[in-house]
A protein has these predicted regions:
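Short, electropositive alpha-helical surface patch
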Residues: 146-157
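N-terminal amphipathic, basic helical "cap/leader" segment at the start of enzyme domains
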Residues: 1-89
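C-terminal helix-cap and adjacent tail motif
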Residues: 5-9, 14, 157-184
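Small-aliphatic-rich amphipathic alpha-helix that forms the alpha element of a beta-alpha
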Residues: 35, 94, 100, 104-147
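Short loop segments at secondary-structure junctions
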Residues: 54-56, 99-101, 164-167
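Short secondary-structure junction motifs
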Residues: 44-47, 128, 157
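Generic hydrophobic/packing signal
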Residues: 64, 68, 91, 96-102
Length: 184
């Protein structure tokens, strides 16, 4: 498959769509290695990943549901239960973190962009391996230091759910690029 075809077939696949097949350690290593090849200004390589498997997924679900309940004005029992189950429906969950350059030699947005490019690499590799993925950034993502230790200058940008899936994904047709480009 060409890189353009791979980009065009990448989709958000949600945990409810995952089957029970486990992603093995070797495959996780391949996904993370692809992320590690993302471009980065001044070679800061700010991406950091925390792998969540097994019983830690239960703990994550409980944490997410509790934080939702604590931080939401319009509480929904449905959403509470969904957050509780989401990690357990996934083969692997990654916390997407960014380690800020301690010298702050480049703007923070560039490091966030580098982490985003690392995720795009990982996501495209997952797509190529028939693994589904979904990046979630709940409103309380800045509370993840209460779930796991983060280093000084490190912060969590999102949660990436991974799993194999069976169903064919829907086709996506983006708006025309002509409406998004101007010539100067």
């Amino acid at each position: 498959m060409s890189i353009l075809d791979l980009i065009k077939t990448r989709r958000s696949i949600f945990p409810e769509q995952f089957n029970r097949k486990e992603i093995d350690d070797e495959t996780i290593d391949i996904l993370l290695e692809s992320a590690n090849w993302a471009p980065t200004h001044k070679k800061t390589e700010p991406w950091r990943f925390k792998i969540i498997r097994g019983d830690s997924k239960v703990r994550l679900g409980e944490f997410l549901a509790r934080k939702y309940k604590e931080n939401t004005v319009k509480f929904s029992e449905y959403k509470f239960k969904k957050l509780l189950k989401k990690p357990m429906l996934s083969s692997v969950v990654l916390l997407i973190c960014m380690q800020r350059d301690h010298n702050e030699s480049i703007p923070e947005w560039e490091e966030i962009a580098a982490v985003s490019m690392a995720i795009q690499n990982l996501w495209l590799t997952a797509t190529d391996l028939n693994i589904g993925g979904y990046w979630s950034s709940p409103s309380f993502i800045n509370k993840m230091n209460e779930f796991t230790k983060l280093n000084s200058g490190e912060r969590c940008l999102g949660i990436f759910y991974l799993g194999y899936y069976d169903k064919k994904t829907n086709e996506r047709v983006p708006g025309s690029i002509k409406n998004k480009v101007s010539i100067i």
